[in-house]
């Protein structure tokens, strides 16, 4: 569970010790720094990042059904077929546990598609955790992380949550200190294709195997953001200048750190003072979707 922001909103227990229905929060993330390292033999790039979960979320309603997976989404533009990460998550569990029945999934989407906030990966992880609970499968989180990595590189992070160092393709996780502050997310109406971003990155960066250590700059009492950068900004900002302008304005308004999240398009600022973040929000909200939120932490 999350401290202060319950992962599980409602739970209904049935007579046979399975859970009939769940209502779950599916949280977003931001990347505090993202270093692109050398390309791997499998075609993917190794990365180094800090994943920080934030209290901005979709709501996912799960209900048992006899067989199969049905999906309803309240927003257009989200696939509702077998390519949706939630359906993939169900099929993954069904492959490992063929005796389970079906699931009905209804999503209230708040996290925009293609925003760099990990909405699809978070949804998949939430469904995996929900199925584990509803069917009383008893899968340990470490095993669930391994299963989830077959869906997407950052799905394991959403199984674990909180603040994590991400290595490998983002699936190798280790704990990091919570990055406190008030987070202001600015989500412009820009869709950035991740494949496009990675395709461009090889022509703009001298990718190496030299791994930084972002977590060392974020330790309590030694907080320093000046060496933490997102490599995607080098290609995204020239292609989408509005993103650079948002970053500059957030800095001018008092954010201690500003960055693109993932490959975009969300830009976020971390503010020491909530009042400053609220003031900045009022300046952006007529032009872009804005979200004022807080980081979430794992319950000790």
Please identify what each model-predicted range represents:
Residues 89-96, 143, 147-150, 235, ...:
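Generic non-transmembrane alpha-helical segments
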Residues 71, 158-160, 164-257, 272-275, ...:
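Conserved, helical-rich catalytic subdomain that frames metal- and/or nucleotide-binding sites
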Residues 32, 60, 86, 120, ...:
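Residue-level signal for inorganic ion chemistry
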């Amino acid at each position: 569970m999350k401290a202060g922001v319950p992962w599980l909103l409602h739970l209904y227990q049935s007579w046979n010790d399975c859970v009939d229905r769940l209502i779950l929060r599916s949280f977003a993330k931001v990347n505090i720094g993202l270093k692109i390292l050398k390309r791997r033999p499998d075609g993917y790039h190794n990365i180094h990042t800090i994943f920080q979960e934030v209290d901005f979320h979709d709501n996912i309603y799960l209900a048992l059904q006899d067989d199969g997976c049905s999906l309803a989404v309240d927003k257009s533009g989200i696939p509702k077929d077998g390519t949706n990460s939630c359906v993939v998550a169900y099929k993954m569990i069904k492959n490992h546990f063929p005796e389970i029945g079906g699931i009905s999934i209804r999503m209230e989407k708040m996290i925009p598609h293609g925003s760099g906030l990990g909405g699809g990966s978070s949804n998949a992880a939430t469904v995996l955790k929900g199925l584990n609970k509803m069917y009383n499968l008893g899968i340990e989180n470490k095993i669930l992380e391994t299963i989830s990595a077959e869906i997407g590189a950052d799905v394991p992070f959403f199984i674990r949550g909180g603040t994590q160092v991400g290595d490998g393709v983002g699936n190798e996780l280790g704990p990091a200190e919570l990055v406190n502050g008030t987070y202001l997310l600015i989500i412009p109406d820009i869709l950035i294709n991740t494949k496009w971003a990675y395709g461009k990155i090889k022509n703009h960066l001298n990718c190496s195997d030299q791994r930084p250590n972002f977590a060392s700059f974020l330790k309590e009492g030694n907080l320093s953001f000046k060496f933490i950068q997102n490599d995607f900004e080098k290609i995204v900002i020239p292609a989408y200048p509005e993103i650079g302008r948002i970053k500059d304005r957030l800095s001018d308004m008092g954010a201690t750190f500003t960055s693109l999240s993932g490959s975009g398009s969300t830009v976020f600022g971390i503010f020491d003072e909530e009042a400053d973040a609220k003031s900045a929000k009022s300046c952006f909200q007529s032009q872009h979707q804005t979200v004022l939120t807080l980081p979430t932490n794992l319950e000790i």
